[in-house]
Amino acid sequence: METTASPVPSDLPRLSVVVAMVDPWPAAKACMESLVHQSPEESIEIIVADGNGNGLPAGGLPPRVRWHQKPGRSVFQLRALGFAAARGDIVASTEDHCKVAPDWCRSLLELHDLYPDAGGIGGAVENGADRSTLDWVHFLIANGPYMRPNRHHTTGTITGQANVSFKRKFLPPESREDGVLQMEMNRRLRDRGVELRMDDRLVVWHIQSLGLLGTCRMHFHTGRCIAGFRLPHLSTAGRLLRIASCAILPAFLAGRTAATVFKKKRCRFRLVRGLPFLALLVSCHTFGELIGYWFGAGDSPWKTR
């Protein structure tokens, strides 16, 4: 079911912002407030793909919002639904637990005008859950590579679903039945020769604090989802190689996180203080990938956030 708020300023918006929601309101309140308060003169639509059915309040919708209620869909399926529903020439994505900068939408449009050949532009992700060492380590593993500073340049790797945008003409015409894993989609665009860029003028804050058990579960389910999305493209030999690589995956993930932190000259003390959490979380992720390569994604796509 789709519900539409007041119409966007023009029949076809320039920018579509996709937000996949899996938790009930008010989990996405900060995200939605940061989006609906963007410059009113910009031609924007906000597409909420709601897998809970109660992701937005029951009253009137905020301006420029299209609300697709699809209870029971995974966050990956919801993201695919949002991309398919987008009408703007530029299609952006953020997460329901993120807060975007006040000039985010305007900057997106300006940067896509500035770089007409860029098919995708990723921005900076900063930590908005900064009260505990655990939350910092959780953030650094997944989003440390995208926190500021980032070089403003063409690159083979751009931000995931927290802060990324594409010219719609470069998006794949169809998505897999199990939805969109953003890192996989970015990689496939790169392999097609699509120009990808990073730019720190686009900033979002990632706000996620799940407690110790919840964070461990999140890293396990994320790992299992990654493996599950890879499986259809793996030969038997490739699958066995991925299973074997899990023996060194914890060291690789921990080393990559540490290298990022020390290269960017940020959060070094926080990471050193959180080394036990780092070891625990990369182990949870690795166990998730191992289970995923053996048995598939299972119900993990419905348990990620």
Feature map (PLM): residue ranges:
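A short, conserved alpha-helix in the catalytic core of glycosyltransferases
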Residues: V164, K169-L171, D178-S209, L213
